[in-house]
Amino acid sequence: MVARSPNAKPDRQKAAALAAAAALNPALLRETLKKVDRCMARLQELQYTVAGGAKVVSGVSLSPRSTRGYLRTSLRCKQETVRMRGGASAQKRSPSGKFGGGVGGEGAQWRRMSLPAMLLGETVLEIVQASQFARDIVTAAGATNREPPRTPKPAPRTRKPAAGEPTPLRARRAREKQSHRGGAATRGADAATPPSRSRVRSRIQFKPVSPVAVGRPSVSANRVSPKNRPWAKKAVMFPNPTFHASTSAATDPCATPSPSKKQKRLYKTRSPVAARQTPHKFLVKSPPSALGSKLRMHGKALPARPAAVSPPPPVKAQASPAKTRRCSFSPSRLATRLMSPIKARLSLGRSRDSGVGVGGGPMSGLKQRPGVSLTVRTVSSKISSR
């Protein structure tokens, strides 16, 4: 079920509101109460007239012929009877359709109508009107209480407290400011006194300062990048034993051969000792034997190994630049030589001259092509015989 919006069917709501306002009018309510009281009095008069007795209502003895309403109604009945009986009234007779023209018809019934009957008719009519008004009041009251469902209005947003409204945080800040101002006045006289406890609690101290570090001069101990360090101070993960005492003693003339100084000059990481002329970066040496390293640690020098001298490589005979050119077999070249025998002779002579090496024999290391030379020789011999 969807709730109706407040603006749905405004005409019907306006009419219901007007009816409720008219029904709940205080002046109309007072008039209705008075009318109901009169109806009750008339009903009591009718009851007394029919019964023929006297009743006491609210301590007052009422006679059927003593009320003002009874006297007024009885006067009207007498006037109507005189009008119907008199001669003048006979000429001005009512039309036949109203009371009936017959002597023994409704006219006789009207004459026989008594005063209690007239009182009863008026009382019933007023009771019907009062009951209808009471129903309207009940309907209006029920409609007021049973309103159709409406969309609830949005709740107002909680506004922030104004500057003047006291909050616990504002009160605390005001006390802190007041204490801070009061302490600032006496700060010049007594600078050694610490601040108040509440003020210290409210302040945030990110980095506590030790009293020892206050007196010392500040020393910057920033980390140095390894690439900016000198060569000797760089950490070596896997130290090379060939760079220890032998390298430094050979390259540094000022280095002393005493083992104690050598041990002192070595670093904890067993990295090479800084020398005046550092060894080359890509210099690779074969590591010494285990016995030699033990003797070196004890300070004893070993005789140097004789360097193994290998025989020099044989010098190959250099080929002539004419023969280094590769001569491959090609049908087009062969056809060209067949067409021009002079060129074939020249090329054949060149090949013969170049085929002889320094010692008069063929050159070693070059691939000989006997098939091509044989073919060229046979072709040239045929051409010369012709």
Swiss-Prot record:
| UniProt xrefs under InterPro entries | TAN1 (IPR044709)
User: What ranges does the record list as Basic residues composition bias?
Assistant: 170-180
UniProt-annotated location(s): Cytoplasm; Cytoplasm, Cytoskeleton; Cytoplasm, Cytoskeleton, Spindle; Cytoplasm, Cytoskeleton, Phragmoplast
Q: Which GO terms describe its cellular component?
A: microtubule associated complex; phragmoplast; preprophase band; spindle
Gene name tied to this protein: TAN1
- Keywords annotated in UniProt: Cytoplasm, Cytoskeleton
Q: What is this protein called?
A: Microtubule-binding protein TANGLED1
For this protein's source organism, the top of the classification is: Eukaryota, Viridiplantae, Streptophyta, Embryophyta, Tracheophyta
Q: Where is the composition biased (Low complexity)?
A: 181-193
**Region Disordered: which residues?**
83-105, 140-202, 244-266, 303-330, 345-386
Species name: Zea mays (Maize)
Does the UniProt entry include the keyword Cytoplasm?
A: yes
Task: Please describe what this protein does.
Answer: Is required for spatial control cell division during leaf development. Through an association with microtubules, acts both for the positioning of cytoskeletal arrays that establish planes of cell division during prophase and for spatial guidance of expanding phragmoplasts toward preestablished cortical division sites (CDS) during cytokinesis.
List compositional bias (Polar residues) regions by residue number.
375-386
**Summary of the knockout phenotype:** Mutant tan1 displays a shorter stature with smaller, more erect leaves than normal. Moreover, mutant leaves have a distinctly roughened, crepe-papery texture compared to the smooth surface of a normal leaf.
Task: Report, as the record phrases it, the tissue specificity of this protein.
Answer: Expressed in vegetative shoot tips consisting of leaf primordia and the bases of immature leaves, the shoot apical meristem, and unexpanded stem tissue. Strongly expressed in tissues enriched in dividing cells: ear primordia and embryos.
- Give an example GO molecular function: microtubule binding
